[in-house]
């Protein structure tokens, strides 16, 4: 038996400001830190020993994990993987969602955010928001760094890493991942065999641990959120 715990980072500064965040590094708000601490307490109450910790390259997910580990009194190192990053929102990066909807229409914004294979225009490689101009990504091959992504692109990126690096470690081991709305959405599509329509409408709340219990041959026995009050209130960034 093994457990996989998925936690979307706590509320970030740009979540609060309703801006498209994507690969930009923004930290948690005070509320986000509280959410992360609460997530840690919920996980602690499950009495599960975590063998491996994973997070994305992004500060908000890393900070969430560090807070959780502090609550769990765990000093284990965690793996940072850029493949677990949020979806790259291209030229929408940094824009306010409400103002953008007024300019190009709510239907168009909804299409960009929730369609399976439609992506926004590319983010200029001259932009300070582009990963190529961020020191964190200087060791990542340039050809692997996106200018924009669809949810399908995000799914393919996340799943390749998960299947190669994380899933093999799940056999009789427990793993905790802190990541993002769309990268966790991608994992849920794979783990629960969701179709494209189901995955685009799936909401992932901030700071609410999703715990998946696997049995023999990694067959899912049970899946539940640890805080039912937080379901269906969050949106991807």
Region spans (language model):
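Short catalytic helix/loop segments, enriched in acidic residues and glycine
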Residues: 22-38
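Residue-level detector of conserved catalytic or cofactor/ligand-binding positions
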Residues: 229-237
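Glycine-rich N-terminal loop/short-helix segment of MobA-like nucleotidyltransferase
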Residues: 11-26
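Active-site-adjacent alpha-helix immediately C-terminal to a catalytic or transition-state-stabilizing loop
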Residues: 4, 62, 70, 145, ...
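Amphipathic, non-transmembrane alpha-helical scaffold segments
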Residues: 29, 33, 54, 58, ...
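Active-site glycine-centered loops adjacent to acidic/histidine catalytic or metal-binding residues
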Residues: 9, 83, 180
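Phosphate-coordination/substrate-recognition cap region in phosphate-metabolizing enzymes
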Residues: 39-131, 137-139, 189-211
């Amino acid at each position: 038996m093994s457990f996989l715990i998925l936690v979307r980072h706590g509320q970030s500064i740009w979540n609060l400001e309703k801006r498209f965040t994507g690969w930009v590094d923004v930290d948690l708000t005070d509320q986000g830190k509280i959410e992360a601490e609460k997530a840690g307490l919920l996980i602690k109450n499950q009495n599960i020993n975590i063998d491996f910790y994973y997070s994305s390259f992004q500060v908000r997910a890393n900070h969430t994990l560090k807070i959780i580990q502090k609550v769990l009194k765990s000093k284990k190192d965690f793996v940072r993987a850029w493949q677990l990053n949020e979806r790259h929102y291209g030229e929408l990066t940094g824009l306010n969602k409400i103002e953008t909807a007024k300019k190009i229409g709510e239907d168009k914004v909804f299409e960009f955010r929730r369609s399976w294979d439609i992506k926004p225009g590319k983010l200029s490689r001259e932009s300070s928001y582009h990963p190529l101009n961020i020191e964190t990504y200087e060791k990542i091959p340039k050809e692997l760094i996106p200018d924009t992504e669809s949810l399908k692109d995000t799914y393919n990126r996340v799943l390749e890493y998960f299947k190669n690096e994380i899933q093999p470690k799940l056999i009789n081991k427990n793993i905790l991942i802190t990541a993002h709305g769309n990268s966790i959405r991608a994992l849920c599509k794979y783990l629960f065999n969701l179709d494209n329509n189901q995955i685009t409408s799936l909401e992932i709340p901030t700071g609410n641990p999703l715990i998946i219990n696997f049995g023999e041959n990694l067959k899912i026995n049970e899946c539940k959120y640890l805080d039912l009050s937080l379901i269906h209130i969050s949106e991807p960034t």
